[in-house]
């Protein structure tokens, strides 16, 4: 959940590192630091706080053409300058940055480093001290680095500088994302291609347990035992301008507004020249052959999976289970004879999901990944991949990836139904085009939604979202958005569950937002609204055109009943955005969170 960047070349290292870290700040922002190497040695600058603070502290007079940087989300040790990366060995010859969690760091300390004094609370310092200890034994940095990597258990993406070798960055990874960016007379290392898009669009994948020697003019990939690995580079499908806010005050608002564009992009990508659905034949076969689908996801992706379950069961007549990734390995259900696992992850790097993928691959079961990042770990390791085509999502709170996931799941469900020969009165591409138009109408109603956010969330500490059927899943996502960025305690409930306990929490002025977009439950959810109003709640009803009543606070345009989450979630996202804005919260980088959860 941290971000690392490295550079070796001819240009000003400091600016490249700082700019790269700014692009990676969504991965963590508890603390940050850089280390640069020149003829006078290694220069380390670390701060508690964000990259802007680091910029202020960096000595701009120090010239260097080689360095590493890190932005941290704390796992071992509190956020502090002492625990911030880069970390150095006792002699200061070796300097390291690390993303991940070393599970056996205490064992290594006891077995190899009993005589070493540590200055931080991190597992990362153990790695760099181990490398120094092994270098004393071998007098060879690559050998020491390789053996150290072989001793580590857990997840890591590592960049190392040897103060006595200005020609090589030493790099390795296991279960954590890391790429090498390729340039002319320079090369880079980064957790995410977004960090280095201004320098290059050519990248080399690094696989687990590989050692990479990065020089100015070459990159050599080796196995842990020194065998050279040949690998072709790939071109990143991201434009650098897509990672900028432009005229928007926040990435989140920009990404909310981009959702109509994303819907049209998905239509384009999943439509053939005849206007029919276009999917990989292997995916079609896998879906048709499956007797049960197991959706594995976390957070917002899990909420999208709940909507996807309804699509697949209603349209394709295949039973579906949706599981929280972090719990699945502990409580694996009895699997069907022909299961297909569907992993949903914006980043394609979610550690909990990857752990499940590794487990089910060992069992020989097929896997399909829905991800926004081509070439990501889940995409690479699953049997099949469907891309979301949402473009880079920078804000920590997911918006456009959520709606992209739902749209792609709808396409997958309809295509599977047709492959199975089932009759459907539902054309997803045409209906998604209608959704895109509805989204544009909704994103133009910001002033109205901003006022509603002031009225309902201005001073509250708690809020409840209720819905029935599909609206219940949107209520869960709406609550997550509000709590993520405004720090209001919010929960999403099934309307029918209110009387089974939750209604005890309703008191005078408690905001309750009720969603009603399904005709068959409209009467019931309005009954729930009356129940909470009778107990003092400040109720807001958000309804769909055709189901509205005069007292409703907000009405969304009519869309197909299967796709209502794509429309009803837009006002929920904007309510959360304005609630956070008016409470002076950091919308794009909420406290204690990171966008890409790459540790379990």
UniProtKB/Swiss-Prot annotation:
Catalytic site: 2, 595
Domain of life: Bacteria
Residues that span the membrane, as ranges: none
GO molecular function: carbohydrate derivative binding; glutamine-fructose-6-phosphate transaminase (isomerizing) activity
Keywords tagged on the record: Aminotransferase, Cytoplasm, Glutamine amidotransferase, Repeat, Transferase
GO BP, sorted A to Z: carbohydrate metabolic process; fructose 6-phosphate metabolic process; protein N-linked glycosylation; UDP-N-acetylglucosamine metabolic process
InterPro entries listed in its UniProt record: GATase_2_dom, GFAT, GFAT_N, GlmS/AgaS_SIS, GlmS/FrlB_SIS, Ntn_hydrolases_N, SIS_dom, SIS_dom_sf
Subunit structure: Homodimer.
Protein name: Glutamine--fructose-6-phosphate aminotransferase [isomerizing]
Provenance organism: Oceanobacillus iheyensis (strain DSM 14371 / CIP 107618 / JCM 11309 / KCTC 3954 / HTE831)
Lineage: Bacteria, Bacillati, Bacillota, Bacilli, Bacillales
